[in-house]
Structures are given as C-alpha cells and as structure tokens.
Amino acid sequence: MFKDRKDAGIQLAKKLIGYKNKNVVVLAIPRGGLPLGAIVAEALNAPLDIVLTKKIGHPLNKEFAIGAVSLQGKYVADSAEATHRYIEEETRRIRKILRQRQDQYYKNFAPKILKDKIVIVVDDGVATGSTILATVSLIKEEEPSKIVVAFPVGSSSAINRLYNSPFIDEVVCIEVPKHFNAVGQFYRNFNPVLDKKAMQILKESNKHFIVSKYE
C-alpha cells in the first residue's frame, strides 16, 4: 500500500538508482504517471517526457484497462469484454483527447529524442499491461538502446505479459499483490492528476533539459 503517488515515486526511484547519470530519458504515461516520473527523473538526473497513450476502460469499470490507444494505433486485449462498436467509439473519443494533449504539452517544446537512449517508462500502476505494451510498441520504432518499464504495483498477469514482450528489456515493479482488482486500491490517496497539474510537473522537471522547438 502506498500513501500517494509521491510516496510511490520515491520508492520507485530507489529501485532505479543504478541508472543515475546514465544516458536516460524518463517517459511518464500521463496523467497518473507524471508525478512518479518527475521524482524518478530528478533522482536519476535525467530529462522527463510523456508518452501520448491512453487506456480503453472496461464498459463496466473504466479504471480497468482492456486496451490502449495512441495517435497512430491501438491495442485491445484478446480477453476484452466489449463490443466492436464500443472499442471504435472509445478509440475516436480517446484520440481526440490525445490530440488536445499533444497541442497542450508540446505547445512550446519539442519531444525528447529517444534514439540510442535508455528509456524508462513510468506509470502509477499496471492492471493489464495494455497501456504499457502499446506505449512500448511506439517507443521501439525510435530505436532506443534499452527499454525499461517501471511502476509501483502490478497484477501478476500483467507482469507476465510484460516479461514476455520482445521489446521490453527490464521490468521493475515494487509490489505484485495476490488479489488485484484495480491500481487505485493500492493507494490511500489516488486523486486524479489534472492536465494543468501534469503540464506544470513536466515543465518544472525539465528546467535544465528542455529544448525549445523554435531553436
């Protein structure tokens, strides 16, 4: 059980300290992964960026991911209990949100270059692994030297899926509970991270690393 995302981020950073001052870029999955990603990036003396992916929630439990969407593609779990119509409607809705976030987050700054970098993908927890798997499939196209996925808590089934991914080099997880329903149950405080706060975190974290897209 974690007190909040700050507590989880501090504990996660300790697990990743071996990457300090290496050729690392920390990628947070917004919005929940950003508070943790900022703590990890600071501890490792690394720049922080985001990945524009968002989960497709189960029709009866939006917090439980049955897939994930990016601007370029989507991933849906084989066991997803949802209609094709629901998946397509959610995909359109989510892509609209992602385009808005792209405009907001990258209004003045360019995304980090990932080629030949050690990329550490951070989220606040993993229920199915769908979001991270979709994320990693996009990251791999940018030819990083290594991909690490890191999160405080995850289901055993998700951990197995991530370990079996040919694109993931290392999985770092603090807790793998026997009984797992949703990520939020393992936080005392799991309040949502609003876009305004997320953008502030990203800006503050990158004061020494940000490169303007106009340079």
Q: Model-derived features: where do they sit?
A:
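PRPP-associated nucleotide enzymes
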Residues: 1-215
